[in-house]
Amino acid sequence: MSINHIIYPLEEQSERLNIDVCDIHACNIYSDNPITYDNIEARAYEQLSDDVEINGGDGELNIFNTTGAIGSNLIPANTVRKGSKYKVYSHGRIETNGANQMFIIKTKLGNAIIEEKTITLPNLNNGSIYQFNGEILLYEIGNAGIAIAKSFFNFSFTDQQGLTENYFIDQTNNTTFQTTADAVADITVEWIDTNPANIFNCHSLTFSKIY
């Protein structure tokens, strides 16, 4: 195969979005056809720093740790189109102080809450892990009241015995979401039970954009 018709306006886009052009995947780079923005996934943020740990009693905290990370979780204004997606990949360690411990996880773009879910956990001892993966699809762009973002997420946890449970999250924001002003992507966690033995430890977080 040959690389005959690669078009590189993406580098200009990368400067605006703080993305790594070398990290493009999910596209047919080796095709003889010109590359378009369709289905190009570009990493905007990758956590390389220390784990982010949130304990019971800490309040609502962000699992994005921009210190030492690659890229940025800042989304510049007017850099998306109808049909664009944001993708989230996150995993880490989770422990509870007994059964029926609850926490709230929220995904935000600027001031808009794209998803909010209360998760109820069983007794999870040392060695239990979680994954929080999914995407945000932009149905419409523009000002608040016009723009529409829909989230499709899966939060799963696996206990020390290898048993896995899933929460599927499907929510829409068509009131406060907008694409015409700069917005920071955040994912926050807050334990409802304030016992510090409840631990949510984010080990890895990737935030990507699909054009």
Residue ranges of model-derived segments:
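Surface-exposed molecular-recognition determinants
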Residues: 38-211
